[in-house]
Structure formats: structure tokens, C-alpha cells
Amino acid sequence: MKVAVLGAAGGIGQALALLLKTQLPSGSELSLYDIAPVTPGVAVDLSHIPTAVKIKGFSGEDATPALEGADVVLISAGVARKPGMDRSDLFNVNAGIVKNLVQQIATTCPKACVGIITNPVNTTVAIAAEVLKKAGVYDKNKLFGVTTLDIIRSNTFVAELKGKLPTDVEVPVIGGHSGVTILPLLSQIPGVSFTEQEVADLTKRIQNAGTEVVEAKAGGGSATLSMGQAAARFGLSLVRALQGEKDVVECAYVEGDGQYARFFSQPLLLGKNGVEERKSIGKLSAFEQNALEGMLDTLKKDIALGEEFVNK
């Protein structure tokens, strides 16, 4: 099993690479790529960790050597949010980066499962899909927007509020991966109930958690370590499913049946070919139903922006 991390010299990429080096199954290969010249050194640094995961780093304009034979590609390349920016301000820079890298994937490892971490995910996933489609290699069961950070944040905040172990809480989060498009389904957590005020406050905190980190870092960055952990959780789940493990379920942002929007984050059963089954989002509370209906215009606009970027 070979996993490639593109954008591996950045804050998310390094955290992700560290977690993959320590947690990928024995015998896996990990390849790191970034435009930054430090990348081969990041791989050498990680290679000293005693796990049976082979690692190699590549830098420069061409990601091809890192992508050859990859089963899973995780893309975290791009610029990070600064205070006062929202995820859409990132679009102008990151759209071109994602387009370029996905073109290289289409040529070098078109059958790989691809996880997009680079923000704004609502839009960058649409860009990736259109690029793969143009190349004639698009498989909607193998392209994912990694929204796992919304899930782990939800788990943490709910556990804090309710005095539970974070590992005992699993909150499904649907929709997209920015602002109002992030919808935690707090009504679906077994054995936990909330007041209306708690639901409103928690939902808002989960939606704005990225800004919480950006402000706390006082201009020094955005959520990199928690995002690295979230991306590792998703990547490792995908690897386990590809290797044949059963009942691996994660939420991610994928192309579905278009019931709500072309791309939508929902619980997915993962399998040997990527998405095995798009699971139902279940019964929503009145609050959740309203929030879902209220986000769709925003989500559809985000998606259209990505489609137009490739097809203009």
C-alpha cells in the first residue's frame, strides 16, 4: 500500500506524515512531495523513526516520482488562512495548486483514491473532479473532500460539554466544510441530549472552530496539528478499507446522487474500491432540517465556482 502526501512540508503535511509514518500498516510505503526544497529532509528526519514504513521525499515542480504507484493521495498543498481571511479568500491561490496537482495524478496514478484537504474544500473537490473528468479518469467513488476535522472537533466539544470521554462520542457531520455548510447532527448521538440553546451554541462553535484557532495563533497560522490528525484518521481508515477491512465508516465530502448538491458530506461505507455505499443521513431534527435547507445555496455556489474554474 503506497500513500503519497502532496504538500508534505507544510504544517498539516508534516503532522500528517508523522502520524502516517507511525501508524500505517507494516510494509506500507509513504512518499512525501512538496515544492519546498526541505521535503527530502523531512523524509530523512521521519525515516529515523523505527516503524516498518518506507519513506521517501521529493521536491521541485514535478510530483510524478512521488505519485508513481500510489494507492492513496492526500493533498494538503496550498496557503493557510490568516486572520481576517475566510476559506474562500484562499480560493484564488489554492485553486491553481489543486488543479495542477490533480492533473499530475490523472497522468501518473489515475486509479488512486484522492483525499483533498486543501481549502476551500467545498470548491477544491469540484475542481479535482472536473480535472479528472477532462482527463477521462474520474471515478466518483475515489475522490474525497476530507471533512474529518469537523467530526473530531464535534466529538471533542460534545464530550467536553457533557462530561464524556471524547473517544466514546461520534458525531456525524454533513453538508460541506466551511461556515454554515458544516452541519453536525447532534440529534443523532446515542444517549446524549441537548437543550435548544446548547444545539445552537455548539453548532456555531463547530462551524467557527477554524477561526478560533486562527485567532488564537495570532497571525502565526491556522489549524495544522488537529487537521493533520483528522487527515491521518481518514487516510488510515481508507487504507484499512482498501486492504479489505469491513465496516469502515467515515464522513467525507463526495459526489453523490445530487439530492442536496452535487457534492455533499455524509457517512460513507468504505471498501476495496473507495466508496462502497453512501449511507443515509437519517432523520434530522427541525433545527437540522432548517440548517440543511439554509446552507444549500452557499454550497451550490461554492461547487459552481470550482466547476467554472476548470471549464472557463
Curated annotation (Swiss-Prot):
HAMAP family, per the entry: Malate_dehydrog_1
Record: active site: H177
UniProt keyword annotation of RNA-binding present: no
PANTHER family: MALATE AND LACTATE DEHYDROGENASE, MALATE DEHYDROGENASE, MITOCHONDRIAL
Annotated positions binding NAD(+): G7, A8, A9, G10, G11, I12, G13, D34, N94, I117, T118, N119, M227
Gene Ontology annotations for the cellular component aspect, listed alphabetically: cytoplasm
GO BP term (any one): tricarboxylic acid cycle
Function: Catalyzes the reversible oxidation of malate to oxaloacetate.
Binding locations of substrate: R81, R87, N119, R153
Coiled-coil segments on the chain, per record: none
Native species: Citrobacter koseri (strain ATCC BAA-895 / CDC 4225-83 / SGSC4696)
Protein name according to UniProt: Malate dehydrogenase
Enzyme type, top EC level: oxidoreductase
GO-annotated molecular function: L-malate dehydrogenase (NAD+) activity
Keywords: NAD, Oxidoreductase, Tricarboxylic acid cycle
Family designation: Belongs to the LDH/MDH superfamily. MDH type 1 family.
Subunit comment: Homodimer.
